Structures are given as C-alpha cells and as structure tokens.
Amino acid sequence: MDITQLLAFSVKNKASDLHLSAGLPPMIRVHGDVRRINIDPLDHKQVHAMIYDIMNDTQRKNYEEFLEVDFSFEIDGLARFRVNAFNHNRGAGAVLRTIPSKILSLEQLNAPKIFGDLALKPRGMVLVTGPTGSGKSTTLAAMVNFLNETEYGHILTVEDPIEFVHESKKCLINQREVGPHTLSFNAALKSALREDPDAILVGEMRDLETIRLAMSAAETGHLVFGTLHTSSAAKTIDRIIDVFPAEEKEMIRSMLSESLQAVISQTLCKTKEGTGRVAAHEIMLGTSAIRNLIREAKVAQMYSSIQTGSSVGMQTLDQNLSDLVKRNIISAAEARGKAKIPENFPG
C-alpha cells in the first residue's frame, strides 16, 4: 500500500488518525481505539518515503532541519489531512489526522442551540477548549460555517496549519497559515486589525502575546473564536490569567470579564453501541454573575454558577453526561470515566 491507499483505507474505516511508525504496521484510530492494519511492518525507508511523498520542498527542509514538522494537505475526492511528521527511536514516524472535506453543520453535530447564538454575537470572545482530539476544530468550523451562511461580513482565520477549508458564502473568508502566509500568530493578529474583519478565528492561543492580541481584538468590537487545551471553563480562566505577570493580572481580569462571551469545554465519549463518538460539553456563558466572578478572582465559585444557569443555556460537563446516559447514548461507565465527580455515575 502507498500513502494514498493507506489514507483511503483510513477514511473508509472512519478513522480519525493514521499512524505511521518505522518498525511497525500502520495503525488507525477508530472511535478512540488504535488498531493495527493487517499488513507487514514498515521500515524506516518506507515511512520516510511515504512522508516525503506528501511534503513540499519547504516542509522537507524543515523536517530535516528541525526533525519534526506540521502541515496539512488535501487529496481530491477523499479528504484533507493534518500531519505531524517526526523521528523516534526506530526511525521516521507520522500521524495524519483526517479533516472531512465537508464541514458538518451544528445540526449534524447535535450541538446545543446556544452555539449558533454565540456564532452570531457581534463582538467578544468565544473559546472552545478540551484535550487534543476532542473535536474543538470540528465545533469551531461548524460555528464559523453557521456565521458564514447567516450573516454578511469578513471572517479571518489564523491557523497552524489550516484545517477545515471554508468557502466564502455570505461572508468573505480569508484563511492564513503560519509559515506560508504569515510569520506567526502574533504578526497575523496585529495585521488582522487593519484588515476589516468582523470575526477572527485564532487556531491556538498558545502564548501571552497571542492571548493579549486576541483579547484586544475582542475588546475593540470583533468576534474572536479561539482554542485552548484546558479541560474546564474555570481552568480556562485560570490559564489565561496565569500567563500574565502579577502586575497585569487585575487589568487582564477586567478585560476578560468585559469581552468573554463563552467558554465551551468539550470531550468525546464513545457511544453505547460502540459505533461512534459523541461530544459532551461544559458551557459557561458571560453572564453578569460570571463576569463579576472573573473580575473578583472568584474562579472557584464558577462551577455552582454554571450548575444553576441552565435557563440561559449553561451546563456542567456532568449535567450533560447525565443527560447522555438518560438518553441511552453513552453508558454510565463511559460517563464515569469523563466526569468531574465520578461518584455521580454508579454502576
């Protein structure tokens, strides 16, 4: 099998990822589980050749120089793929994540109605958080697509690398990739404010300057979508504030309390039938109570505010997990493994 055949096999089997690792057969991740493909192990030369086949000259140069590289590419009629190529103790390796060519709608994702409302906010910051592989990019792509189909405006994305490719519908969409199109997230965000955007998607808010620029954009009348690798709304607030030096924390709390529209923290759960995965969400909205808690550094009290905020669309992760168990979508055991308070899910 060549790389295209392996990727076609991966897509056909609804795999989220294809793993290539010298010394072992190729493997795919299906519904969260890694499974071996029933072919002979690949040696270093084979894996290296497969990786080189899908790289351009710049990516090859970066791989040789830095020993690892991130990029994305598309196979017409199949899908788009996000790639991390690296080296390990047996030789070359790569993980290729499937990015569907067709962006799923919020309805197809069974997303809460509030996600559509958030996508149409005129300004402020909407953060989607969760561990790697929790579907953050899929959720954000659906929200951006909803805005694109509903309103007239300019959406600018800054990604590393570009994942979902958006077609301009009602909105003009410009997508920029760190490397080929801009030197850094920071440079792109500074430039973005002079590019007349209505909404900005920041692929990853990974450092102080990126977070500062994203918050500034939200504060100056733009809708900013962003991601963090935090597992809850409270941890997200802590993470943002902890990045800044002590003398700035009070000002940052004030900025965040003014600009935050929502934090959506999600995780993927295996369905009861074992035929797929479903997202479970904690949803915290920028209500006046939440804004006050951010301003007053009372992050620990957020959980109870979220718990009692169902009338406005808020929910804790455990509340959503409980609902999924009641609807027979996931098992109590699966919920217990994901829950903040596992004792709530006996059995």
PLM region spans:
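Short, flexible helix-loop junctions that flank or precede catalytic/ligand sites
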Residues: 1-347
